[in-house]
Design a protein with these regions (language model features):
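A short, conserved alpha-helix in the catalytic core of glycosyltransferases
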Residues: 171, 177, 181-182, 189-220
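Short beta-strand-to-loop acidic/aromatic patch adjacent to the donor-nucleotide binding site
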Residues: 91-103
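Short, flexible, basic/aromatic active-site loop/helix in glycosyltransferases
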Residues: 141-164
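Active-site donor/metal-binding and catalytic loop motifs
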Residues: 213-238
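Glycine-rich, basic loop-to-helix element that forms the pyrophosphate-binding segment
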Residues: 68-86
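Acidic donor-binding segment of Leloir-type glycosyltransferases
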Residues: 28-66
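Short beta-strand-to-loop element that shapes/binds the nucleotide-sugar donor at the catalytic cleft/hinge
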Residues: 124-140
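Short, well-formed alpha-helical segments that are part of the catalytic scaffolds
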Residues: 14-33
Length: 284
């Protein structure tokens, strides 16, 4: 049994069925090159579980299909995947979060697992290159191949022997740490998406202890293609539902700590501004 398990939310739109299935197929084809590992797939629609399993069968991966084909949002879907692994796959040491618009090299997960083996980090992210050729945490860009598609060799050519401050998906959790923090809490995060990653980062920040000065890290020795980090934007969901839940869960100081945890200037400014609004004396 592999000590790495992947999680994937299967969100197929009826009006873009062929396009979404092709995207997922390309993703899984690249993932199977890394070996036959468990992949817990949460079916969020519009396929029935029987239809979804038929789409997954061609790939040489150990699929565990959960969910009922209903779009329950990121928090519920991911948390269900985590709980399934922790309850049913006890030998798994590391758990990833994948998106269907990703392409992988055969060894990207081994690189991240090797890093976690050698450190006490609760989580680590892979480096990414997006559809515009931007490598966000490497502070540079690359020209994407115009012919032949995105190969593993091309992604490997973008790697650096460097660990930097930051967070993105795909990420890999240490299962023991995830069990301790509880993962995502749908009782607070009642929205469809947004800010669930911030909740998770705060959980790890407190897990490691404030004195440790822990910051999330990106390992640029592994590189993954991630077309876009905002699949849920523009789908009509209220992004502030989860923000309000984040505040209920962690309070104003949680926002202050997030302004220090994030690498991105936008996130730092956003969370600090919200903290200052809440901390301002009444009537100001």
């Amino acid at each position: 049994m592999s000590n790495i398990a992947h999680t994937l939310l299967l969100f197929v739109r009826e009006q873009q069925l062929a396009q979404d299935l092709a995207l997922i197929g390309t993703c899984l084809h690249s993932l199977e090159a890394g070996g036959r590992r468990p992949v817990v797939v949460y079916n969020q629609g519009c396929l029935s579980n029987e239809q979804a399993f038929e789409q997954l069968k061609p790939f040489h991966l150990e699929f565990h299909l959960i969910g009922k084909g209903e779009n329950t949002g990121t928090t519920v879907g991911r948390q269900a995947c985590f709980e399934y692994i922790l309850q049913n796959l006890p030998d798994v040491a590391y758990i990833t979060e994948l998106h269907p618009d990703m392409l992988f090299t055969p060894h990207w997960a081994d690189v991240l697992a090797g890093y976690l083996d050698q450190t006490d980090e609760p989580i680590v992210s892979s480096g990414i290159v997006n559809r515009s050729g931007v490598l966000p945490f490497a502070d540079r860009s690359a020209e994407l191949p115009k012919q032949g598609g995105l190969s593993a060799a091309f992604l490997d050519s973008l790697c650096e022997d460097r660990i930097v401050h930051g967070f993105n998906n795909p990420c890999m959790h240490r299962a023991q740490a995830l069990r301790s923090t509880g993962g995502y809490n749908p009782s607070f995060l009642t929205g469809m998406s947004c800010f669930e990653d911030d909740s998770m980062l705060l959980g790890y920040y407190y897990y490691c202890g404030i004195r440790s000065g822990w910051r999330p890290k990106v390992n640029l020795n592994a590189m993954v293609y991630h077309a876009t980090a905002s699949q849920w934007v523009g789908l009509g969901y209220n992004q502030m539902d989860n923000f309000n839940g984040l505040v209920r869960q962690y309070g104003a100081m949680g926002l202050k700590h997030l302004s220090e945890l994030h690498q991105s200037p936008w996130h730092r400014s956003f969370f600090l501004g919200r903290y200052e609004q809440l901390a301002a004396p009444a009537g100001n």
